[in-house]
Amino acid sequence: MAREKTERVVFTFHTTTMAMKMEQAAKETGKPGRLIPVPRQISSGCGMAWSAPAGDRREAELLVREYGIETEGVYELLL
């Protein structure tokens, strides 16, 4: 049986370094989310993306600014 899709906010990055920095920042602050392969619907320079519940978009955007993480794009998708 297929898993139910949920709305997610997805951040893409130009480099793997920035993707890993996002993962580390989220772990340090206890924010939800995880690294995923970039979904087919979008493209990214490094092939890795950060996925978090769509309701946590504002918190994730604050984390990006606070830690100086450079993103390529931000999307809301059903994943």
Regions found by a protein language model. Name each.
Residues S51-L79:
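C-terminal structural segments of small proteins and small subunits
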Residues A2-T12:
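Short glycine-/aliphatic-rich beta-strand segments at the starts of folded cytosolic domains
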Residues H14-P32:
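Short amphipathic alpha-helix segments
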Residues V10-T12, G47-S51:
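Short aromatic/hydrophobic contact patches that present stacked aromatics
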Residues M1-A2, L35-Q41:
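Short, flexible, solvent-exposed loop/turn segments with mixed acidic/basic and small polar residues
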Residues R3, T16, E59:
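Long, contiguous binding/interaction regions
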Residues R40-C46, E76-L79:
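Short proline/glycine- and acidic-rich turn/helix-capping motifs at secondary-structure junctions
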Residues P32-V38, E72-G73:
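A short linear hydrophobic-aromatic micro-motif
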